[in-house]
Amino acid sequence: LEKISQAAMARDVARKARDSVRRKGTFELSGLPGKLADCQIQKREGTELFIVEGDSAGGSAKQGRVREYQAVLPLRGKILNTYVNGKNNGEDQSTKALSKMMSSNEIVTLINALGTGSKDFNIENLRYDKIVIMTDADVDGSHIRTLLLTFLNNYPFNQLIENGHVYLAQPPLFKVTKANKSIYIKNEKA
């Protein structure tokens, strides 16, 4: 009985230490992905994380952002397409899907930037008020946007959508200039 009690206390101390480190690290720069251009505000309220497609778009987004409250995270390539319907497949399938997704460096980078954790997900540790997916207006951008939304729709990350933290930005497809006047067009029909 004493060994059980000591083991329970050790688990509790370890959990508190993990939570303390996580809370401490939530708004500190250490441990954040190198590609992340973080914002200057150290609180979540009013901050925005722009997830952009590729390093070149990341460079443009970094130049055009308001550093005070906007962060930019460029992701390269397409993430793994894994979705599990928890109602039909059960918890075991969700766990397998999550571990499969965690094999992607881009997903690990995204989760680290969000600050919520994965298996020990806690929405209270979310570093940004708004998560804005901003991909190119072409077919590849649409596919990457769909894959990111699919990932965010999986448990436990679906809480980000349910709590109104996920947004989509629609960039223009073309810029048309005539006589020193420019307009942006979002599709080929315009």
Can you annotate each of these PLM segments?
Residues L1-A10, M134-H143, Y155:
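N-terminal assembly/transducer modules of large multi-domain enzymes
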Residues S56-G58, G77-L80, D138-D140, V166-L168, ...:
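Conserved nucleotide-binding/hydrolysis micro-motifs of P-loop NTPases
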Residues L1-K78, V84-G90, F121-I123:
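GHKL-family ATPase ATP-binding module
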Residues R67-Y69, F151-F157:
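A short alpha->loop->secondary-structure connector
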Residues K24, P33, H165-A190:
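Charged C-terminal transducer/switch regions of large nucleotide-driven machines
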Residues L32, A61-I131, I161, K178, ...:
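Intrinsically disordered, low-complexity regulatory segments
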Residues E106-T109, H143-F151:
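Alpha-helical scaffold elements adjacent to nucleotide-binding pockets in ATP/GTP-utilizing enzyme cores
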Residues I51-E53, Y128-D138:
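Acidic beta-strand-to-loop metal/phosphate-binding motif
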